[in-house]
Design a protein with these regions (language model features):
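Non-catalytic helical/linker scaffolds that mediate oligomerization, partner binding
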Residues: 1-477
């Protein structure tokens, strides 16, 4: 079994029912929809296809809505053709609505002239092109000198390292997209360019305003700004999970700082028992090639050794030539890394004293699984918290997570080592054990006489945290 979960971005290369089924068979656990691209009609069609295929295959596939956030981009180009920017030439970025050419391009951010000053760096297209600000004119035009030129295409990202950008954390577009996501009942929402805890609090308030029932939707904070690292602990405290978004992070920071930032973020998430996804360019060469580079393979494995819960594919599945092969490769790398994780894992389960019974029981169950030849740990949960806490202890056996809640069932597909089961509500310990045995005997190699560990909150008729642990022999009443 593979414990690390795989997030796949859905796009033109994989948005048919046939391709989605192949992604699921290859190992996809979560489908990401990137709201920087596409219309609501496009996303609604993809969601409908994902739901149909997942139901047909009887597989719990969560949907992650990734909001664009305050991304600053260049505008359109004359005749929609790329232009070549040459080193040393002057180039203007303007808020005026003009078609772009080799002399100027417009930007989606009207506040750019007010935020930058002479000497500031402007990076285009994930840092591939670099400009230096020389002056600002008329409140609309930023005159720059091209430091590192290259080919500029339409709608490319603009990064401003070291510049305090006064963009809102939740844009009008984000609010419209969030309302759409609530309507579509997505399982997770990712917020881009989180800089402080208040950014996460803002989107949580927006969810409540849209629909009080949507308040439980977990928020994944994408950490891609230096300010996010300055406020790391407070962001992780309020978010339900975090994403190591290495694309923009690697532009805002020096590239050599990104591996350290990745380890810091993963460590903080695990210490606080929050979900963490590692993303961006993990198998980037597979957009065009059927096999990855050796460096990419090592990158995926090292993220797993660092303690990530999930790894993510972006362009590899959304627009690449080898989407299915990319997922298969990601799954095989994860399985191989997990086979050696005991030797190379670089983090340890937090061992602090706790007054939380569910945390103490999760630790005890994980230690018991190491000491005895149990086949699995079964946990009953309504919200998914018990499964998530147990996942963060990194037991050496699968976690079978039983829930009567359909949304929790899907959301648990993002949790490391968790196999979700949707079952009727259990009103007694005997019913719980019956659910466990039915699942084991139907879907696993566990056989009568072997042992599993059960964690639950008793009495099951009340919503209580885990307070009960049992070492159970399968087939023995």
């Amino acid at each position: 079994m593979r414990y690390t979960k795989i997030v796949c971005t859905i796009g033109p290369a994989c948005n048919t029912e046939e391709k989605i089924a192949q992604l699921i068979d290859a190992g996809m656990n979560v489908a990401r929809l990137n709201f920087s691209h596409g219309t609501h009609q496009d996303h609604a069609a993809n969601i409908a296809r994902l739901r149909r295929v997942a139901n047909r295959l009887n597989r719990p596939i969560a949907i992650l809505q990734d909001l664009q956030g305050p991304k600053i981009r260049t505008g359109w180009l004359q005749d929609h053709k790329p232009v070549e920017l040459k080193d040393g030439a002057e180039f203007v970025i303007t808020t005026r609505a003009v078609p772009g050419d080799v002399r100027e391009v417009n930007t989606t951010y009207d506040g750019l002239p007010g935020d930058v000053k002479t000497g500031d760096r402007i990076l285009l297209d994930d840092g591939l092109l670099e400009l230096r600000v020389e002056r600002v004119a008329d409140g609309t035009d930023v005159h720059t000198r091209i430091v590192h030129g290259g080919i500029l295409k339409e709608h490319k990202g603009i990064n401003l390292p070291g510049v305090l950008v006064n963009t809102p954390s939740l844009t009008d577009k984000d609010r419209e997209d969030l309302a759409f996501g609530v309507q579509q009942q997505v399982e997770y929402v990712a917020l881009s360019f989180v800089r402080r805890a208040e950014d996460v609090a803002l989107i949580k308030r927006a969810l409540v305003e849209l629909d009080p029932k949507a308040a439980k939707t977990p928020i994944i904070a994408k950490l891609e700004k230096p300010a996010a690292l300055d406020n790391l602990d407070s962001i992780v405290d309020i978010a339900d999970g975090v994403m190591v978004a290495r694309g923009d992070l690697g532009v805002e920071l020096s590239p050599q700082q990104v591996p350290i930032a990745q380890k810091r973020i993963i460590e903080a998430a695990n210490r606080k028992r929050k979900i963490v996804i590692t993303a961006t360019q993990m198998l980037d060469s597979m957009i065009h090639n059927p096999i990855p580079t050796r460096a990419e393979v090592s990158d995926v494995a090292n993220a797993i050794f660092d303690g990530t819960d999930a790894v993510m594919l972006s362009g590899e599945t959304a627009s690449g030539q080898y989407p299915i092969e990319s997922v298969k490769m990601m799954a095989s790398i994860a399985e191989e890394a997990e086979a050696h994780s005991g030797k190379y894992t670089r983090w340890e389960v937090p061992e602090e004293v706790t007054s939380d019974d569910s945390i103490a029981l999760a630790r005890a169950a994980s230690e018991l699984a190491h000491d005895r030849e149990v086949q699995a740990i079964a946990v009953f949960t309504l919200t998914g918290r018990n499964a998530r806490v147990l996942s963060k202890t990194r037991p050496n056996v699968p976690i079978l997570a039983f829930t009567p809640d359909a949304k929790t069932h899907l959301r648990m597909s993002l949790m490391w080592g968790v196999i979700p089961y949707l079952v009727p509500h259990a009103d007694s310990l005997e019913t719980m054990l019956a659910h466990v045995e039915a699942a084991l005997l139907l879907n696993s190699p566990v056989r009568p006489g072997q042992q599993v560990i059960l964690i639950a909150g008793l009495p099951p008729t009340k919503l209580v945290p885990a307070n009960f642990i049992l070492l159970h022999t399968v087939g023995r009443s």
